[in-house]
């Protein structure tokens, strides 16, 4: 994930929990050389209260690049519902959106998600698969195509429900279809409005 530190960004690619519960983070620098940083759990918690993102996919350790060719596995369909107009009453619009979505879930118009985050100015909706999909195994080509097709239709379905309900201030962001997409980490602050990203729904089934 990325986080700001002294005004810049540091990119950590892999995380390992050590036997003593410390956390080891492998950092890729600009010249793709590895650097290793260690955090205690409390130090990591402190870091995670900052401006942090996490990738939806895992990446191969070829050169540390967050690019399509470097994607290793995908296991999440993420729907990003955003409010871009800063003049809009964000909470009122999101409450209205939540009612529409709840009705859609209850009436089987949409599959119930794994988790929903309030991102500060929108909703981040996660569908986490039971098994990840490898990006490089040739035998899984049809599975990958099916994943992409279902994912695109899912995002379109969210947008069509918003349109049908007359909600014009919230939009489904189709940029989430990018394999290298980053999403905000729950518990961190959205610097655009100072609000904390919170998990507001978690499917326990």
Language-model segments: which ranges?
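Glycine-centered loop/turn motif at secondary-structure junctions
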Residues: 105-110, 162, 166
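Short amphipathic alpha-helical segments
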Residues: 95-107
